[in-house]
Amino acid sequence: MAATGEALTTQGYISHHLHHLQVGSGFWTVNIDSMIFSVILGALFIWIFRKVAATATSGVPGKLQCFVEMVVEFVDDTVKGIFHGKSKLIAPLALTVFIWVFLMNLMDLIPVDYLPYTAQVLGIPYLRVVPSADVNITMSMALGVFALIIIYSIKMKGVSGFVKELTLNPFNHWALIPVNLALELVTLLSKPISLGLRLFGNMYAGELVFILIAGLLPWWSQWLLSVPWALFHILVITLQAFIFMVLTIVYLSMASEDH
């Protein structure tokens, strides 16, 4: 499948499927497809959970209500086991992160040609449908968590306490402030970097495997590899959403500790 309609080589097929629908150029390039799908999936999450909340009954619940209640209880128990501070934001944030990332990851199970081919028929040359396989999306989410880490640190320790934590830890001596600052900044900055790149790396690799299977094998034999990989990838999808949520809670719990 090519943007101009001609037959593609295997290399061209893979390259085409890894190309985003973009506007702008250079640093200001925006991946429109990633933004659209992430917003749609976020809206889907809000709609489903609001619908369940509005129609919840104390009687015999439906299947959707049971599922939502199970997820909410699971996330709430996870937060209680990790976050020991007092905040009404953490549990809703954890739920949002878990479901939103899971839905973005879940897009990887859609056959690689379905939506891009449909988009091409509509005159859209490129389309990538897995937002969490876009480093811009994962790092944006990680930077949002990083901002909350700074906010919670300052809220609990004050500006002076936060500065002292960066400059007088682990060596409590003014002469070692440069060493302390270097060590603490590396530790602090590694949190959003590892958070964003871990999710991106796993989902990009998963997407690439599906594309390689579709690009290298004839259509009648692709299921021999794609079905087992999809079944395994269901575990990866769920696990990566869970890890992102847990690390978010852990980092905010560490920031909320009053030393």
From Swiss-Prot:
Gene Ontology MF annotations: proton-transporting ATP synthase activity, rotational mechanism
Localization of this protein: Cell inner membrane
Gene Ontology cellular component list: plasma membrane; proton-transporting ATP synthase complex
Keyword Ion transport attributed: yes
Highest taxon above the source species: Bacteria
UniProt record, GO biological process: proton motive force-driven plasma membrane ATP synthesis
Bilayer-spanning residue ranges: 29-49, 90-110, 134-154, 208-228, 230-250
Membrane topology, record value: Multi-pass membrane protein
Pfam family, one: ATP-synt_A
S-S bridge residues: none
InterPro entries in the record: ATP_syn_F0_a_bact/chloroplast, ATP_synth_F0_asu, ATP_synth_F0_asu_AS, F0_ATP_A_sf
Keywords: ATP synthesis, Cell inner membrane, Cell membrane, CF(0), Hydrogen ion transport, Ion transport, Membrane, Transmembrane, Transmembrane helix, Transport
HAMAP family registered for this protein in UniProt: ATP_synth_a_bact
Family listed: Belongs to the ATPase A chain family.
Subunit annotation: F-type ATPases have 2 components, CF(1) - the catalytic core - and CF(0) - the membrane proton channel. CF(1) has five subunits: alpha(3), beta(3), gamma(1), delta(1), epsilon(1). CF(0) has three main subunits: a(1), b(2) and c(9-12). The alpha and beta chains form an alternating ring which encloses part of the gamma chain. CF(1) is attached to CF(0) by a central stalk formed by the gamma and epsilon chains, while a peripheral stalk is formed by the delta and b chains.
Entry function: Key component of the proton channel; it plays a direct role in the translocation of protons across the membrane.
Name of the protein in its database record: ATP synthase subunit a
Lineage of the organism: Bacteria, Pseudomonadati, Pseudomonadota, Gammaproteobacteria, Aeromonadales
